Amino acid sequence: LNREKVLDRMDAETLLVVVDTHKRSYVEQPELLEKTNKIVVIDHHRRSADFINQSILTFQEVYASSAAELVTELIQYTQTEVELPTIEAEALYAGIMMDTKNFTFKTGVRTFEAAAYLRRCGIDIIKVKKWFQSDLESYNRISEIVKKSEIIHDTIAIALYDVQEKDTSLI
């Protein structure tokens, strides 16, 4: 959905969930915050002055490793049985991996409990890890693409790349 379609479909009763930030200025489309009276904020960063204060629910836990950990906890401990699709469980696991730098930074018991729950949901840990691996050949191709890129309007980089079947990880 593009910005216009989202704005057209929203009304005062639409539930807007803001994840991994509580700062109004970090929301990609801040105008969405004005279109609804129902906002939920899920974040693991320390509270700042630019807080989204009109939320009906704020789940902010600075001791959590990631917003993905918090979302996993919400799903895991809900009273209704939730069947989490594997791809969504893998996306949450990837979020935890990214924010913890492969479970080495800012991890706690809750982090590993969330990861264990996602594992029980059937995730393929090797597949998720491969999403973030790059070999030397891929790194060199990416370097070439970046080297040939052009900057426009001082903020946008554009590069052309001849996509080949074996290069799908670069897309």
Which ranges hold each PLM region?
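Short glycine-rich anion-binding loops that position phosphate/pyrophosphate groups of nucleotides
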Residues: K5, T21-R24, H45-R47, V163-E165
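Hydrophobic helix-and-loop "lid/oligomerization" segment in the mid-to-C-terminal part
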Residues: L1, L7-L15, Y93, M98-I171
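Short alpha-helices
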Residues: H44-A114
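Solvent-exposed alpha-helices and their adjacent loops that cap or buttress functional pockets
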Residues: D8-D11, E31-E34, F51-I52, L84-T86, ...
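A short helix->loop->beta-strand "cap" motif at the edges of active sites that frequently abuts
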Residues: K35-I39
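A generic local secondary-structure boundary/capping motif
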Residues: E4-L7, V27-E31, T58-E61, E81-E83, ...
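N-terminal small/polar loop signature for handling phosphorylated ligands or for N-terminal nucleophile
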Residues: L1-E34
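Generic enzyme active-site microenvironment
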Residues: V18, V41, M97
